[in-house]
């Protein structure tokens, strides 16, 4: 007779979880940041608010964003005028868009990841789907399973409305699933569409306009699993450890509320200051076991909440400008895509490392950190180990 302990041992993978493939996708509608203020004030019938428009222009100029992708086109917005009006009841119209489009965009990214992975999709055992919008039953995880034609026995986990830290959360969860289930192959998808947060300008709620200047749409997918099959599966990064923490004295710093008017975001405190003040503690806890204390000796993937967060983190830790190069590149090319950002940055980094002929997927370095920041203030910290290119 076998013991529970023996069964337990047999169920577990031998090695650490690895990221085996990454795929990304965006809507086709590309928005130029330099002309966005004119477009935004025109489409929301707010051109009379000239002072506010100048403020918004300055926000966009300082955003360090070059372009973004958005599902919401001028045509869609003209058909749904309530989405454009500040604080107009519009949740039904928004929901109708996102419950369809979030899984569809997720499917595009997933197909690219599955193709790179090179294994039949029937080998996917788990799905972790993450989005800030479009709560529905059955959810986006179910829709994705149907769209991709995955097995009905695939084990699904749906994460709604976590916010910008959740790119770290999905990696943490997938790591545990892969390491605790022998042979598990976890499809992770973060799909974010801003149709639920888009709204017209308000001179009394400038914090809501920060989001209008920063947020973009995008989806990213990964295949995560332990014990890669030699010659078949080619890991990109190994997942070493993962942690989550709430920052002290940060309650209410970022919050979002789903109401009849859509998902409203509020930035209530000095978010860049709170993050930069506390980030070293998370780094020390994560890297002390590895004997690493030089933050310039590791590669960096940080959620680009906005340029001020990156600037203050860089300053506080004395990071060389090139450390956040991949992070800033994604912010410039796509804006803040909430949970999907850090997956895009991982993709950018491994591609740039290969293109530049560097020795590892992590810019030629062995160890790295991935940070997610978001409502709470919640910080996700993932320690990564790169793979030889």
From Swiss-Prot:
Active site residues per record: 164
Short name of any one Pfam family annotated for the protein: Chal_sti_synt_C
Presence of keyword Acyltransferase: yes
GO terms of molecular function: acyltransferase activity, transferring groups other than amino-acyl groups; naringenin-chalcone synthase activity
Catalysed reactions, as listed in the record: (E)-4-coumaroyl-CoA + 3 malonyl-CoA + 3 H(+) = 2',4,4',6'-tetrahydroxychalcone + 3 CO2 + 4 CoA
Biological or metabolic pathway of the protein: Secondary metabolite biosynthesis; flavonoid biosynthesis
EC number: 2.3.1.74
Keyword Cell division part of the UniProt annotation: no
Protein's GO biological process: flavonoid biosynthetic process; polyketide biosynthetic process
Transmembrane segments: none
Keywords in alphabetical order: Acyltransferase, Flavonoid biosynthesis, Transferase
InterPro entries linked: Chalcone/stilbene_synt_C, Chalcone/stilbene_synt_N, Chalcone/stilbene_synthase_AS, Polyketide_synthase_type-III, Thiolase-like
Protein family: Belongs to the thiolase-like superfamily. Chalcone/stilbene synthases family.
Task performed by this protein: The primary product of this enzyme is 4,2',4',6'-tetrahydroxychalcone (also termed naringenin-chalcone or chalcone) which can under specific conditions spontaneously isomerize into naringenin.
Protein name, as recorded: Chalcone synthase 2
UniProt gene name: CHS2
